[in-house]
Amino acid sequence: MMNNLDDNFDAILITGPTASGKSALALRLAAEVGGVVINADSMQVYDTLRVVTARPSEEDMQAVPHHLYGHVVAGAAYSTGDWLRDVAVLLQDLQAQNRLPVIVGGTGLYFKALTGGLSDMPAIPEAVRVMLRQRERVEGAESLHRDLTLRDPTVAARLDPRDGQRIIRALEVLEVTGQSISVFQTRSGPMIIDPQRARKLVVLPDRKLLHDRINRRFAMMMDEGAVEEVEALLAQNLSLDMPAMKAIGVSQIAAMLKGEISREDVIEKSSAATRQYAKRQMTWFRNQMNETWERVDPAANRSG
């Protein structure tokens, strides 16, 4: 079933929940077709968190070229638009080299933007971002939601009053443009990859096997440098609002370093959080990825 994947396709796209074996599948397919692997995971872009975010090993990255892994400093914001621009540059280079991109990751929005275009959002000055994050810390998300309700009731009605991230995003656009974020959400930029010219795979493993992998993986991470990575991250004194600080395992290991919980608690809590995240991903993929996305069982295809 996996033979001749490069025939008549401009790219191979692989998504699926965390710990599903999609990275191993991407590595194998890229090696088979002489392609390169491109990251589509919003946490694996950060430099400090190689182990915690389960980036490919150095051995794998040497076996096949890998791009957009660990290229963003932990203290920087990195949006879907930033990722899309980086991918567009890469794809131009790969086309000139006649090499097939194998794009893999669990961030569904990246794939939606890649194949369907991204809403044409305005640039937000850092000062506005900082101001609104500070307001959320002091006043709370529900206070910001009340503000949004007064200024943009239609959008506010769609948002959970506790969803600080989306509330802040809507307020950022209002602050900078004076217009509702909904105005910009209806404007889509060009697609980067024609979905009809891509082989699209969703890795959907057996639930029990996935949970077993998750439970084993975090214990291994603790032995392979996860604690040291989190220590290095905490030493940067970053705002808790930064995406890198929200990676699963960071808050749990930080609590252990403070003496609040044990190593065993870290493994249990982080594994539970990862299982919940994988469940949300599985639901999203089943609902958002239509029949043109081929469902793949990693065990049946020996993808690891």
UniProtKB/Swiss-Prot annotation:
InterPro entries: Dimethylallyltransferase (IPR039657), IPT (IPR018022), P-loop_NTPase (IPR027417). Its EC number is 2.5.1.75. Catalyzes the transfer of a dimethylallyl group onto the adenine at position 37 in tRNAs that read codons beginning with uridine, leading to the formation of N6-(dimethylallyl)adenosine (i(6)A). GO terms for biological process: tRNA modification. Monomer. This is tRNA dimethylallyltransferase. One of its GO terms (molecular function) is ATP binding. Its cofactor is Mg(2+). It holds the Pfam family IPPT. Gene3D superfamilies: 1.10.20.140, P-loop containing nucleotide triphosphate hydrolases. ATP binds at G16, P17, T18, A19, S20, G21, K22, S23.
